[in-house]
């Protein structure tokens, strides 16, 4: 499987042969859904909280005597059925994270890469280095390349000037290759990999 390599100026820089076991799979939506759900659940704050009967500021005195009034039997007015009472089975602070096997996560990443390749939404670029960190100049380059909504994966480290110029652009994400993940790949229209990122991914899944 071969991809043409482009440059930030829109020129050609040869081609690269990639492993079909990484970029040529038949995408499985179930794997992608499981991985995205795992990522979003892990980042969910889980800080929602309501007060239980033991926490609200209300007297615990019995409302009226047990017998003789003709009314239903009640204890304290902090019970959930009364106005101002506690919430029954309300949310408490907890972690929403759940486990997903490492092999499934790795397979989902390969399927996400394959999905972009199959949709012709994967671009390999020679390098992402800039002499200055000017956002306007980079925006013009992206406009010429058609990268209005893209995830750009650099090498082990992202060029400082490139990262500074790209961070002010909406719908453009820049990550080092170690940070590549299924959710960020799928939420952008285009995936841009540097030559160094392709080599790192090939080595990772060897």
Curated annotation (Swiss-Prot):
**What Pfam families does the record tag this protein with?**
Ribosomal_L4 (PF00573)
**Per the UniProt entry, what are the Gene Ontology biological process annotations, in alphabetical order?**
translation
Q: Which residues cross the membrane?
A: none
Quote the InterPro entries the UniProt record gives.
Ribosomal_uL4, Ribosomal_uL4-like, Ribosomal_uL4_dom_sf
Ranges for the region named Disordered are 49-79
What's in the keyword line of the UniProt record? Ribonucleoprotein, Ribosomal protein, RNA-binding, rRNA-binding
Q: What are the GO cellular component annotations?
A: ribonucleoprotein complex; ribosome
Q: Which GO molecular-function terms appear in the entry?
A: rRNA binding; structural constituent of ribosome
The record's comment on protein family reads: Belongs to the universal ribosomal protein uL4 family.
**NCBIfam families tied to this protein:** rplD_bact
Q: How does it assemble?
A: Part of the 50S ribosomal subunit.
- Cross-referenced PANTHER family: 50S RIBOSOMAL PROTEIN L4, LARGE RIBOSOMAL SUBUNIT PROTEIN UL4M
Q: What does this protein do?
A: One of the primary rRNA binding proteins, this protein initially binds near the 5'-end of the 23S rRNA. It is important during the early stages of 50S assembly. It makes multiple contacts with different domains of the 23S rRNA in the assembled 50S subunit and ribosome. Forms part of the polypeptide exit tunnel.
Under HAMAP family, the record lists: Ribosomal_uL4_B
Name of the protein in its database record: Large ribosomal subunit protein uL4
Q: Which organism is it from?
A: Methylobacterium sp. (strain 4-46)
């Amino acid at each position: 499987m071969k991809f043409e390599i482009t440059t930030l100026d829109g020129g050609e820089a040869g081609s690269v042969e990639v492993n079909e076991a990484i970029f040529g799979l038949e995408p499985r939506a179930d794997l992608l859904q499981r991985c995205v759900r795992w990522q979003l659940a892990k980042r969910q704050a889980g800080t929602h909280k309501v007060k239980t009967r033991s926490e609200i500021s209300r007297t615990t005195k019995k409302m009226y005597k047990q017998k003789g009034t003709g009314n239903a039997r009640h204890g304290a007015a902090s019970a959930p059925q009364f106005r101002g009472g506690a919430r029954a089975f309300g949310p408490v602070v907890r972690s929403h994270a759940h486990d997903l096997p490492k092999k499934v996560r790795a397979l989902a990443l390969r399927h996400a890469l394959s999905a972009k390749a199959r949709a012709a939404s994967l671009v390999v670029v020679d390098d992402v280095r800039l002499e200055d960190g000017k956002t306007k100049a980079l925006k013009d380059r992206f406009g010429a390349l058609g990268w209005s909504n893209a995830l750009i994966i650099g090498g082990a480290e992202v060029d400082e000037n490139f990262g500074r110029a790209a961070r002010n652009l909406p719908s453009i994400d820049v990550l080092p290759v170690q940070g590549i993940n299924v959710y960020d790949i799928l939420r952008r229209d285009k995936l841009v990999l540097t030559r160094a990122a392709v080599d790192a991914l090939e080595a990772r899944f060897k």
